Amino acid sequence: MTQVVPGIAPHGGQLIQRIATAAERQEFLAQADHLPRVQLDERALSDLVMIAIGGFSPLNGFMGQTDYESVVDDMRLANGLPWSVPITLSVTEEVAEPLKEGGWVRLDDAQGRFVGVLELTQKYRYNKVHEATNVYRTDEEQHPGVAVVYAQGPINLAGPIWLLQRDAHPLFPSYQIDPIASRQQFADRGWKTVVGFQTRNPIHRAHEYIIKCALETVDGLFLHPLVGATKSDDIPADVRMRCYEIMLEHYFPQDRVILAINPSAMRYAGPREAIFHALIRKNYGCTHFIVGRDHAGVGNYYGTYDAQHLFDEFKPEELGILPMKFEHAFYCTRTQAMASTKTSPSSPEERIHLSGTKVRELLRKGELPPPEFSRPEVAAELIRAMRSDSEVAAV
């Protein structure tokens, strides 16, 4: 099902909607006990939701072999449309064997609840090492994204989906804004240009600097932190959300920012994921997307500006969303302000470089991030959360 929506065209031209109506849901529920079952892990469940709400438009289901191979090899769907990350439902041979192409498959969450259905059009094998090498640029299992690929089943199930059940987010129900709603909110505020910002870290001073630089040139900011599956050492989503709320309350104009959660899972695919994140924000209605240093990177697998360079391999009209590329920002001790090499007269010795990794290292040591790293209210919240977790662990 597609729908006419306000704002820029979604990727592929139509905002996909695969949420079952009440009548459709009842029809599927009546068949529940007779359908073969596949249990979804956290990432597959978030992918199901993102497909259903249109966040992954133009996808209406999990990728078939032709699309999958085209994306892995060429960063395009089989029809030529740019798409950089495969969206697949991988299962074991034991799960796949009894499933019949052309039939319906019941999709359950981890609690065994019937949350969706898959119209199974294809079952196919895939090369895990080839996917890892092409998508993640490494075959090392130490890479968290590669580890997921290696751990999942060897058979992909493909076909359109329907979402039957979706709970409000247990922690952030008020920030659960789907693409059709975000687009309407942008229109209601009169925003013609909107910049999206992807983050899985608390906003430190370098983030704040580049966000405000971007906000100088557009009508509004869509702050869209990822709350799906991340690495175990990433700062928990509830802590990060409190930090975002603090930043918006004290340091941003309230009428020019919308905060919403991104329910998709982090893949740590670096440059390819930067393209993926931009296309998602396009579907949410953003016209621009911030791409900073080492976007969606992990460890030393990607170059500092590889993600920015990858955007240059596509024609702007193909992507349909403009990347706003920023250099690594730092705190300049000479001017006592945030800057980049484009705006600072300082020497390297006068620059304090900031990163989410450094903030996490300080927190693990029980140290308060300095004001050059984080706003004091944010630093206080981070250290409070860290101490609270330590107290719980000690019980």
Swiss-Prot record:
<dbReference type="GO" id="GO:0004781">
    <property type="term" value="F:sulfate adenylyltransferase (ATP) activity"/>
</dbReference>
<dbReference type="GO" id="GO:0000103">
    <property type="term" value="P:sulfate assimilation"/>
</dbReference>
<dbReference type="GO" id="GO:0070814">
    <property type="term" value="P:hydrogen sulfide biosynthetic process"/>
</dbReference>
<keyword id="KW-0547">Nucleotide-binding</keyword>
<comment type="similarity">
    <text>Belongs to the sulfate adenylyltransferase family.</text>
</comment>
<keyword id="KW-0067">ATP-binding</keyword>
<dbReference type="InterPro" id="IPR025980">
    <property type="entry name" value="ATP-Sase_PUA-like_dom"/>
</dbReference>
<keyword id="KW-0548">Nucleotidyltransferase</keyword>
<dbReference type="Pfam" id="PF01747">
    <property type="entry name" value="ATP-sulfurylase"/>
</dbReference>
<dbReference type="InterPro" id="IPR015947">
    <property type="entry name" value="PUA-like_sf"/>
</dbReference>
<keyword id="KW-0808">Transferase</keyword>
<dbReference type="InterPro" id="IPR020792">
    <property type="entry name" value="SO4_adenylyltransferase_pro"/>
</dbReference>
<dbReference type="GO" id="GO:0005524">
    <property type="term" value="F:ATP binding"/>
</dbReference>
<dbReference type="InterPro" id="IPR024951">
    <property type="entry name" value="Sulfurylase_cat_dom"/>
</dbReference>
<protein>
    <recommendedName>
        <fullName>Sulfate adenylyltransferase</fullName>
        <ecNumber>2.7.7.4</ecNumber>
    </recommendedName>
</protein>
<dbReference type="InterPro" id="IPR014729">
    <property type="entry name" value="Rossmann-like_a/b/a_fold"/>
</dbReference>
<comment type="pathway">
    <text>Sulfur metabolism; hydrogen sulfide biosynthesis; sulfite from sulfate: step 1/3.</text>
</comment>
<dbReference type="Pfam" id="PF14306">
    <property type="entry name" value="PUA_2"/>
</dbReference>
<dbReference type="InterPro" id="IPR002650">
    <property type="entry name" value="Sulphate_adenylyltransferase"/>
</dbReference>
